């Protein structure tokens, strides 16, 4: 059975790399189809905007998981990048910081969605996270990174982490929703190396970058 699906894709000036990939209900992937579209558009007036989103957690709902440097590191990154990048490179710098007990899954998600409605293809988006991280097995037995939000009360319970944390797959989906043509994700969290593979395709196809420590 053949089904035709239509998508509207916003194009940025210059080369745009488009890739389509289908998979069956049993998760068997078809050979991907890809093409390059060279879009000639009027040069946008003015400079791009920067969207800087920082999350740092020292205090968790379960105090035995509290950290010492999550929030200070995030605040330092916010100040350093926010101040430095205001110096002429961007038209506007939009900064959002969520810290400690305010950094719930719901609040973190809400800010991603807010920026997804504001950023334009010519803009730049930077996300920085400092806090706990866990890598668990997904339904196919593959490693999946979870950003541990402040309302996760038990790091040693996989179901609790999956319910209250934000998975690498969710982060990828937020990245796709945010239309900024240049994106960078930085993670200062345990076990965050596994998220690099999850972001590999975006990194290749859309000019995104991921750093982890």
Where are these predicted regions, by residue range?
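Active-site-proximal C-terminal subdomain of hydrolase catalytic domains
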Residues: 56, 81, 99, 172, ...
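Caspase-like (clan CD) cysteine peptidase catalytic core
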Residues: 49, 106-130, 134-197
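Glycine- and acidic-residue-enriched helix-capping/strand-helix junction motifs
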Residues: 61-79
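Exposed beta-strand face motif in extracellular beta-rich ectodomains
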Residues: 14-18, 123-125
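Acidic/histidine-rich, surface-exposed loop or edge segments in extracytoplasmic proteins
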Residues: 52-63, 91-95
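Functional beta-strand-loop-alpha-helix junction segments that form "active/interaction loops"
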Residues: 2-10, 28-39, 74, 78-123, ...
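Low-complexity, Pro/Ser/Thr- and charge-rich linker/hinge segments at domain boundaries
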Residues: 36-56, 79, 156-158
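Conserved structural position at the C-terminal beta-strand
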Residues: 20-24
């Amino acid at each position: 059975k053949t089904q035709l699906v239509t998508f509207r894709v916003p194009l940025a000036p210059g080369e745009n790399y488009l890739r389509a990939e289908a998979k069956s209900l049993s998760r068997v992937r078809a050979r991907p189809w890809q093409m390059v579209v060279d879009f000639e558009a009027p040069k946008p007036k003015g400079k791009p905007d920067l969207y800087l989103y920082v999350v740092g957690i020292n205090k968790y709902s379960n105090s035995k998981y509290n950290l010492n440097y999550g929030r200070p590191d995030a605040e330092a990154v916010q100040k350093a990048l926010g101040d430095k990048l205001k110096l002429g490179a961007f038209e506007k710098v939009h900064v959002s910081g969520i810290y400690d007990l305010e950094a719930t899954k719901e609040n973190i998600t809400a800010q991603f969605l807010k920026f997804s409605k504001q950023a334009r293809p010519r803009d730049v988006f930077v996300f920085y996270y400092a806090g706990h991280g866990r890598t668990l097995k997904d339904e196919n037995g593959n490693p999946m990174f979870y950003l541990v939000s402040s309302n996760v009360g038990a790091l040693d319970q996989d179901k609790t982490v999956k319910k209250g944390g934000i998975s690498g797959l969710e982060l990828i989906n937020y990245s796709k929703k945010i239309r900024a043509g240049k994106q960078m994700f930085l993670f200062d969290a345990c076990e965050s190396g596994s998220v690099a593979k999850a972001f590999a395709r975006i990194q290749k196809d859309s000019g995104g970058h991921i750093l982890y420590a």
